[in-house]
């Protein structure tokens, strides 16, 4: 790889690292909200709400298409987040 390409690659990687830092902060906020929801649901024995999950995934698919992102990718990401808890 040429030095110029290596420099460009490193610059892109630094941008990705910064973006990853931002994503971690957002995931932390989402995790805190999910924990609050779970605390309320545990009292009602309603941990998994399939209707809500379907609605979330439907909305994510629409938003992905609008932003020209492959909905298969975002579907996998959101499913993993949802079922991680």
In which residue ranges do the predicted regions lie?
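Domain-level signature for soluble enzymes in the chorismate/prephenate branch of the shikimate pathway
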Residues: 1-85
């Amino acid at each position: 790889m040429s030095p110029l390409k290596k420099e460009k690659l490193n610059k892109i990687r630094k941008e990705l690292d910064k973006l990853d830092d931002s994503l971690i902060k957002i995931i932390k906020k989402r995790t805190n909200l999910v924990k609050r929801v779970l605390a309320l649901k545990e009292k009602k024995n309603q941990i998994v709400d399939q209707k809500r999950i379907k609605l979330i995934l439907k909305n994510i698919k629409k938003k992905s298409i609008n932003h020209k992102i492959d909905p298969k990718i975002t579907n996998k990401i959101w499913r993993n987040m949802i079922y991680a808890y």
